[in-house]
């Protein structure tokens, strides 16, 4: 969060915080502490996908930093892609590699996030992310051992025709 706040101040960014309907404590009370391990798809939907869907309902376009070399699913993506709900997804870095990213950082003197130096080149939520080991892919620390490679934001894992935000709305709200 310190890095985010530094960038926000340095570049005068308008950062919007998205949160699920319930706090972590409310989430644990409803689903239990083990949901991230027992049903990571449901956990990702409640804590990440659903809040993004609510925010994106107000948008015409979404710019994302996904790359083809990250997952098999992303390899099939297009730079400009209309999603089922009419949202235009723009992926300007889709054909970039790690070397392209590194060169861009050096050329433009961009600040570096501290987590890749701690072996976290790809970060998700705390229960489902671990540091990578030597020789592993950048995303190997995400959902390790679960056979999962995507949270659902960049897939049709959650069909909006059959699931709505109300399907998983939490009754508990901690302030």
Positions of PLM-derived features:
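Nucleotide-activated chemistry modules centered on ATP-dependent adenylation/adenylyltransferase
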Residues: 1-175
């Amino acid at each position: 969060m310190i890095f985010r706040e530094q960038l926000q101040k340095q570049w005068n960014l308008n950062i919007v915080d998205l949160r699920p309907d319930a706090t972590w404590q409310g989430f644990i009370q409803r689903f239990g502490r083990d949901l991230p391990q027992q049903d990571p798809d449901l956990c990702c939907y409640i804590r990440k996908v659903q809040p993004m869907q609510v925010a994106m309902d107000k948008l015409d376009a979404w710019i994302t930093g996904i790359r083809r070399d990250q997952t098999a699913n992303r390899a099939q993506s297009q730079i400009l892609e209309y999603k089922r709900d009419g949202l235009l997804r723009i992926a300007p870095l889709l054909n970039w590699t790690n070397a392209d990213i590194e060169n861009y950082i050096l050329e433009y003197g961009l600040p570096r996030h501290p987590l890749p130096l701690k072996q976290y080149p790809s970060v998700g939520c705390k229960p489902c992310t671990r540091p990578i080991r030597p020789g592993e892919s950048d995303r190997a620390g995400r959902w390790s051992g679960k056979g999962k490679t995507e949270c659902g934001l960049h897939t049709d894992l959650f069909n909006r025709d059959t699931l709505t935000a109300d399907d998983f709305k939490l009754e508990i709200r901690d302030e």
